[in-house]
Amino acid sequence: MSWRPPAHNAEGQEGLWYRSVCQSHGAFCGCGDFVGHLNRLAERLGRPQPPRPPGGPPGPAIRVLPALPPAEGSPRRHNRTENQPCGGGDADFGDQRDAGDGGAAADDLSPADVEDLLDWLDAPDRSKTPKNRGPRGRCRRRLTFQGEKTPSLARLDLGRNRERSRSPRREDATGAAPTAAQRATTAQMRNPVHVPAINKNAASPPRPSYPSISPKALLFPERLPQMWTKQDWETEQQAAAVWDRPMRNNLTDPPFYPWMPRYRVSLRLGFNPQ
């Protein structure tokens, strides 16, 4: 059965309990004052005792061990068992239980225990005592290598841990100009010479190289001037006569219409051509 939250809080539950008691009293009595009825019953009958278990007379009462006497030389404390409150019940049992725990609640530490405690406080290595910190949460731990590192990794760690300065890098005062051998080595490292591939299999013959005979594909090839046919010039002549324009010397040029008015075009907004 699944748990459901209560429908009422503490005040609501007390109100429901009070109403149920009133209704149960009104079911068998018509006095109308169940509080006074309960008070009269309490004066006449007294405090009700807890119910006895069925199946015969109750067993013998359990006897509680008395408290141990206080140690010699220690100040005597006030014990609650000496002046027990009236009524007994659970309070008496709790007092006797506290007093019966070996006298720990009523006695002080023995001199030997005090000396051991002072010796432990004065010990220099008491901070090395292992402490139980409880279960450790799940978190990432950085793994550290305690052995010797390679020179390359050592340089990386040195550069990572070094603080960077905002000032520009300065050359050392003792730094001399690079020699000719150093400049040659630097140039050789910057411009490596292309080394052709070497055939690793000495038994096989070398692979011959053949010249390329396929045409070269260029992005902007050099085109030869197009040769126009007689039919192309006849079509150009007919088009010039129909649209009343001069013929073009090169058919790839845009045509020109002299009778068309000229317009000034601008991409600016609000431009008024004059």
Curated annotation (Swiss-Prot):
Organism name: Torque teno virus (isolate Human/Germany/KAV/2001)
Lineage, broadest ranks: Viruses, Viruses incertae sedis, Anelloviridae, Alphatorquevirus, Alphatorquevirus homin6
Pfam families tied to this protein: TT_ORF2-like
Chain intervals with Basic and acidic residues compositional bias: 157-173
Biased composition (Low complexity): 174-187
Family matches, as InterPro entries: HEV_TT_vir_Orf2/Gyrovir_Vp2_N (IPR004118)
Record's compositionally biased regions (Pro residues): 48-60
Stretches for region Disordered: 44-190
Stretches that traverse the bilayer: none
Name used for this protein in its record: Uncharacterized ORF2/4 protein
Segments of skewed composition (Basic residues): 129-143
